[in-house]
Structures are given as C-alpha cells and as structure tokens.
Design a protein with these regions (language model features):
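Contiguous, well-folded functional domains in the mature portion of proteins
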Residues: 1-137
Length: 137
C-alpha cells in the first residue's frame, strides 16, 4: 500500500479472533524500518491475528508496518466476534497486509498486486470489504 491508500484492515471471514500477537520492530529507536514490500521488512513492527470460523477453519492476517509511520493500531482484542468485512485495525501510511488461508481449502482470486492476469491487471486496487481475494474449493 502506498501512503495515499486507505489503511483500514477488515476481517477476511466471519468468526472469532482467537489470537493476536504484536511484535515491535527491531533496530535503534524503533528502526531502521524498511518498505513493507521488501523481504527485509520481516524486522518491521507487525501484528499477527488469527480468525476462526465456527467450523474450525483458521485464517491468519499479518499487518506489517512500513518505513514511514511504523504504527499498527488494532481496534479489536482476542475473543472478539467479527463479521466478514468488519474493520479490525489500521496501519498508518506505507504498509503491507498478508492473508494466509489453508491451501487445500481455498484458491486465490488475486495473487499479488504485482502479479497481473486478465481479470485483475497489475496495480489493481482492492475495494474495501467487497473485493474477493480467495474462493473456497
């Protein structure tokens, strides 16, 4: 995401937040932080959130801060029940969000903002709460 994008994050499924883990960034005075799209951003601040559906399916969302503001703001806590598409937090300015689902149960509709295909050209924006990024098999 660029600093000009909307940085609100939404629940990928309806379910309960079963775990939230916050890790501060490594380095001097909360830095140096790297752009979230770089591999080395593994040292940036991050919040890992696990959502669990009633049938037991677990989806992981990793919010990773970027090089500018470096602040993740969670609006939820472990034990909260979420609706699909409900807001659960935000990342200030440049950032990245990874969504991990069981590969045996889902197929991606959008691989990456960097990968283009005939249905989703490179650089296409995700629309808040409505773009489907994976489908059940």
């Amino acid at each position: 995401m660029s600093p000009l994008d909307v940085h609100v994050n939404r629940s990928p499924i309806a379910g309960k937040i079963t775990r939230m883990e916050h890790r501060t960034g490594k380095g001097k005075r909360r830095g140096p932080f790297l752009p979230a799209f770089r591999k080395e951003s593994e040292y940036n601040e991050r919040v890992r959130t696990l959502f669990q559906r009633e049938d037991g399916l677990i989806v992981e969302v990793m919010q990773i801060s970027g090089a500018l503001a470096r602040t993740i703001i969670p609006w939820t806590s472990e034990g909260d029940d979420m609706r699909r598409g409900e807001r659960f937090g935000m990342i200030r300015l440049g950032s990245r969000v990874d969504v991990r689902v069981p590969a045996a149960k889902f197929e991606p509709c959008i691989i990456s903002a960097e990968d283009g295909d005939k249905n989703h050209p490179k650089g296409e924006f995700v629309k808040a709460g409505s773009t489907i990024i994976y489908r059940g098999i």
